[in-house]
Amino acid sequence: MLYNINELKVGLKVIQNKEPYVIIKNECIKPGKGQSFNRVRFKQIKSGKILEKTLKPGDLVESANIVETELIYVYRDRDLWFFMNRDSFDQISVHFDILGKSVKWMVEQLVYVVVFWDNNPILVIPPEFIKLKIIKTNLITKNISTASGNKLAVVSTGAVVKVPFFIQSGELIKVNTHSGSYISRIK
């Protein structure tokens, strides 16, 4: 399906440079003299790169066949991560290269959003907050009760997170996967 510039709106998924993009800004400009045009800002779905284009009346933009599906992460086998559909129990595999930075937030039995383009997975989005166990923390030699600040901790997925000094190995914490930051301790 092709869209003309009057049909473009924020959130629409389209093809630009043979890659899937989402429109994040669409501004219609009507100069005092001459034809109106649209200044459109696109964000590449896979990498997050921003593309800005000026479109004139008559320009057509191709729609992208993008589907976002909630799937449960089941297990890993070498470079493949396997996800299962909750309704049909169908399993799909996602290669390590597609996971990208999400790999450090992969916890079995959690629900992830898998983005498909023409029935091929292109992106895995972890839940915003996840619970993780602290495996190892840096030893602090100062008096912890008077110290303020953070130390580094390795969590069960292998990710490194800055945590407050009072957090010890073996504790559960809540982490924001989008920023990679510590949110709270879970008791």
Swiss-Prot record:
Q: Which InterPro entries match?
A: Elong-fact-P_C, NA-bd_OB-fold, Rib_uL2_dom2, Transl_elong_fac_P/YeiP, Transl_elong_KOW-like, Transl_elong_P/YeiP_cen, Transl_elong_P/YeiP_CS, Transl_elongation_fac_P
- Alphabetized Pfam families for the sequence: EFP, EFP_N, Elong-fact-P_C
Identify the pathway: Protein biosynthesis; polypeptide chain elongation
N6-(3,6-diaminohexanoyl)-5-hydroxylysine, modified sites: 33
Might you report a single GO cellular component term? Answer: cytosol
Keyword annotations for this protein, in alphabetical order, are: Cytoplasm, Elongation factor, Hydroxylation, Protein biosynthesis
User: In what way is this protein post-translationally modified?
Assistant: May be beta-lysylated on the epsilon-amino group of Lys-33 by the combined action of EpmA and EpmB, and then hydroxylated on the C5 position of the same residue by EpmC (if this protein is present). Lysylation is critical for the stimulatory effect of EF-P on peptide-bond formation. The lysylation moiety may extend toward the peptidyltransferase center and stabilize the terminal 3-CCA end of the tRNA. Hydroxylation of the C5 position on Lys-33 may allow additional potential stabilizing hydrogen-bond interactions with the P-tRNA.
Subcellular location per UniProt equals:
Cytoplasm
Major localisation = cytoplasm
- State one molecular function term (GO): translation elongation factor activity
Per the UniProt entry, what is one GO biological process?
A: peptide biosynthetic process
Q: Which family does it belong to?
A: Belongs to the elongation factor P family.
Q: What does this protein do?
A: Involved in peptide bond synthesis. Alleviates ribosome stalling that occurs when 3 or more consecutive Pro residues or the sequence PPG is present in a protein, possibly by augmenting the peptidyl transferase activity of the ribosome. Modification of Lys-33 is required for alleviation.
Name recorded for this polypeptide: Elongation factor P
The organism's lineage? Bacteria, Pseudomonadati, Pseudomonadota, Gammaproteobacteria, Enterobacterales
